[in-house]
Amino acid sequence: MFRRLTRHPRFLSLAARLLGLYVALAHRTTRWTLVADGATEALRGGLAEGPVILAFWHERLTLGPGLWVTMRGRVPALAPKRPQVLVSRHRDGVFIGEVVARFGLETIHGSSAKGGASKGGSAALRAMLRVLRGGGVVAVTPDGPRGPRRVAAPGVGQLAALSGAPVFTYGASTTRCLRLRSWDKAMIPLPFGRGLMVLLPPFVVPPEAGEAGRAAVEALLTEACDAADAWAEAARVGPRAGPGEAAALAAARALASRAPPALATEAAASRPDEARRA
């Protein structure tokens, strides 16, 4: 009886609205530090007026909408845009859609299952391409909706290659949070903590980059999350910044200012000897 009740659409809608309110409360009561020098410079330099792909791991889904709220205030060109978040067609996707709607985000229903064979996957890809070709923003969790954790599906590389849109990778962490026993070890922020947002400079995936695009997204997302987690771990020792916290913040700033990767096409990568002779 109780299990049937928790799966009822009205119950899920109410629970999602309550979670959305909670996530908004946690975001507003957390003292955030944004590390995004390279990304902010690129957006203010004109990229904000065109298509943008924002990627973050599924485990940081509750920390994703807060980045948009923060960046929209820093980059005026982003203000009129409403990001489209890719979610699954399963009921958990509908649940997530209700949560992110609290932050002014919209949803595209599809999936990103490994191997590219997924219900609604091709339709979702077409929908995202339409958004990007119209100059919009698409947010994706490359390891969602079912994992494996921190393993990017091919779809994000394909989307970037087909659209030509720059990819921004994002990680965040807080000093006060819970970790769920889910496949992704989802992070739920608690109110009244401190947090770090790490947004890395954008990179473009060439049409023939192949596996390199997917691998780059995976590596950069993990680096961003690890940098944020290292800072949060150091910052938990007390309310005042210590040497460990300062060092972790400096490392995150260096990462966020690093030049983005320049991806070669698979054809060029397969001829290293010819490239060296040239």
What are these regions (language model features)?
Residues 41-46, 95-96, 119-122:
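Short, solvent-exposed polar/charged micro-motifs at secondary-structure junctions
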